[in-house]
Structure formats: structure tokens, C-alpha cells
Amino acid sequence: CIRDRVRYRQVMGDECEHLLTLSNRVVMLTEIDRGELELHKEEVALRPLLRDIAEKYQLKAAKTIHFDIDCEEGCSVYADAFCLHEILSNLVDNAVKYSNEEVLIILSGKKTEDGTIVRVHDSGIGIPLSEQHKIFNKFERVASGSRKTGTSGFGLGLNYVLQVVSAHGGMVKVESMEGSYSEFTLQFPLR
């Protein structure tokens, strides 16, 4: 049936994209570990980037996702555009995966006198306080979240986020309440 073929092509395309993303992350983590990561920093317009990521996830999600983008026009981040897209996509992907059937994701950005703050806030299942200290470790996964949502993975995503933001001279922090929300805050310096 033609509909089945179209769906199979879509699934194959999605899986190829996932494999490419994972490969890129492994390569970049290896470069970071060796001290060889080259960042090509530039001023990246944040609002259009957040909007593009939101649209991508709304199109491909099987869940009902509501996005709220809270970012002034003209807000920018001095960062490697590819890396910034990858880490924000990773955080949104986690927000979608570790949520119930309907989720609100708030993407926000704000310029400060010290740099730019970017937040990804979701109304998902949250992260138990007892496991929050482990989530940025390589190959670490929060067991309770995987069991609740049936998701799988390698536990590289949040370590990747931390390493890339750190390579930019920034910081990452998480605030979460189990059963309620998670919020990841990325702080990037001015230059």
C-alpha cells in the first residue's frame, strides 16, 4: 500500500537523522575529551532558532505539544550555531520524551549584562531530587523516567549539553520537581 511505503520512508528518514545526530554527539564528545573541539562562534539570533526547533518538534511529535516562546526579538547568543541548535534540540527532545501525552514547553531567552540566559522548561514527569546530581554524567540515565515513559537511549545527551556549554565558557543548571516539571538553564557569556 502506498500509505505504508510513505510511512516506512518517514520512519527510515527519522532513524537516519537520529543515527546522524548520535554520531555527531559522539564525535564532538571525543573532541571535547581530547581538547580538540573547535567552536565557530558568532552572534546567533535566538528567537528564530527557538521557533525553528519548536516547529520541528510539533511536526514530528505523536503527542500534543504546546510551545510558548518567550524571547525578545533581537536577543542573541555568542555561540557556535550548530552546537547551540544541537543542545537546544536535545533538551526539547528530552522534554517531549519524558512527558505525558500533553506537554507545555516554554523556550525562553534573555540578554543580561553578563551574557545570555536560555531556558527550556517543560510540564513533564520531572526528575527525582535523588537522581538530579547524576543526570549530567556520561552514560547515566534516570531509571524512573525511562520506566515511566518507555524511552531508551545511551545517556549521552545531557552530558553533551553540559560539555558543549562548558566549552563556550558557560554553565548549565537544572531545577525539577518529580511529577511536575523540569527546567534547564543555560548561561552563556558575552564573548
Label the model's feature ranges.
Residues 40-44, 66-75:
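Conserved catalytic submotifs in the C-terminal HATPase_c
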Residues 34-39, 76-79:
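Conserved micro-motifs of the catalytic ATP-binding
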Residues 14-19:
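Short alpha-helical segment of the dimerization/phosphotransfer core of two-component systems
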Residues 127-139:
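Short conserved segment of the HATPase_c
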Residues 95-96:
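Short helix-loop "hinge" at the ATP-lid/N-box region of the Bergerat-fold HATPase_c
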Residues 140-152:
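Glycine-rich ATP-lid/hinge loop adjacent to the conserved G-boxes
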